[in-house]
Amino acid sequence: NLNVGPDTAINLAALGALSPDGRCFTFDARANGFVRGEGGGVVVLKRLQAALDDGDDVLCVIRGSAVNNDGGGEGLTAPDQRAQERVLRLAYERAGVAPGQVGYVELHGTGTPLGDRVEAAALGEVLGAERDPGSPLPVGAAKTNIGHLEGAAGIAGLIKAALCVERGEIPPSLTFASAPWPGGSPALAGVSSFGIGGTNCHVVLEAPPEPRPQATADSQPRDLEVPAERPFAWPGPLPFPLSAQAPAALRE
């Protein structure tokens, strides 16, 4: 994401989405909008069995994910709490993970009064219901540190959460201190990313298996043992949307 022209900034300012303080105060009483950031990220996705066979350095395991859309709701910029709850429940159902096991959630957290409040309520309904009152769920948002990368914000959050579960430490959001990973093994984290058009995405990450195998010249493929309580659930048919300015162009 590169801010090379003024148009997007002008439109966001007119929408009232940008923070006049130039800071992103995610989940903070001072939340008054976000600050735009620049950056990008790339990850290599590989089947776990193939990565283990090849002796790759596995940073995390993607246990499950879900995507939905609430674009038919109250308006373009109005998030839907129930839709966010549904995408969270579906992601953890596909991952075979009880929401109460999650040790950290990387928020979408743009730092807007409405968006943060809705996201907090959805997380509380789904991930807070099964938690011990003495073990609150740590949350954070990379946007407080690097701003909102807009189209690249999701991959930034994914990379941050992957490093969290791999290193067993939660880095600080702006004005906070780092913290050790809460109890529980393996380390599990959730990552949320929401689009302005109503698309909601949540991914469940798990710490890599230990110890990490080293590749050898005579290494042989081997079966990966998946515990019965962690079945793989295929998400079903995936849409391939097409659009055009006219029906004839769409057919072509």
Predicted regions mapped to residue ranges:
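Short glycine-/aliphatic-rich beta-strand segments at the starts of folded cytosolic domains
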Residues: 236-243
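N-terminal amphipathic, basic-rich helices that act as targeting or association modules
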Residues: 157, 241, 250-251
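Condensing-enzyme catalytic core of the thiolase-fold
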Residues: 1-232
